[in-house]
Amino acid sequence: MDGWDVLAAIIWSILVFAALCAVGSIVVYVLHSISLYRGLSACGYVDPWMAWAPVLRQYALADCAVHGMDVVCVGRTPFPGWLFRFYWAICWALMLIPYGGWILSIALHVFAEGPCWAAMYGVVDGRDSKDEMLVGYLSAIVPIIPIVKLWNAGK
């Protein structure tokens, strides 16, 4: 076995790994979209089809959670409703900041999306959204949690 065979084996294994990652990502995206669609439908959101569009899904989740309110209280602190509806755009802008912008982006993502998931879980499960807050924040970090929580929503 010469050097070219080793190089070919390395390239082949990288391509197989990339293909498996791509297929896995597509499967998780489809399952996540199905679950989000079911959750939006169970909450009575008028446009649940937005769960399938890459950017619109974040807007639909936040808009469903905010319910047209101008001020949203997280804990006892009030925040403007547009912050939750357009947090994804602010996250993208924060990632343009060099040396730490991505940390701020991740923090805002978890801070803004966590209460949105908690509000949806509260409506779907018939509980107070404050009881679902921890699971909501974890859902903003681990995308498998919404798949499990919302798979049977609205059935």
Model-identified regions with their sequence ranges:
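Active-site loop ensemble at the mouth of alpha/beta enzyme cores that anchors a bound cofactor
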Residues: C91-M95
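Short, strongly hydrophobic alpha-helical membrane anchors
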Residues: M1-S13
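Alpha-helical transmembrane segments
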Residues: L15-V23
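Membrane-interface extramembranous regions at the lipid-water interface
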Residues: G3-V6, G24-I90, L108-K155
